[in-house]
Amino acid sequence: MYKRQNLTNAVERLREGVQAYQENPAKIIRDGVIQRFEFSCELAWKTTREFLLDQGFTELNSPKATMRKAFSYGLIDDEQAWIALLNARNQTSHIYDDATAQEIYSQIESEFVSLFDNLIEQLKRG
């Protein structure tokens, strides 16, 4: 439950960052949103892993393995979207150009925040 609350707080900070960038599209704000995304992503898979371990699952040694199991368990409903989110997270470690950073930001705004929101709702029900 503690991790779930941390995840909820992190996603709220991410949402605040997205709103700030919409109001003032400065690169420094966009980069802050990407940092918040990285943190939210880490909390999302680790919180999901903890939940699944509590359900008796094992072999959850990576983010992708964890989210695949979350899909088969019914905790998330779009496995491919979560794999895309994890791939974007991995890509953030290697951003060297504005175009890539902007592309990842756009995915955060249009897709990834809602994936986090849906996961949080499912974890509350679980």
Task: Label each PLM-derived region with a short phrase.
Residues 3-126:
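Solvent-exposed interaction patches of small proteins and small membrane subunits
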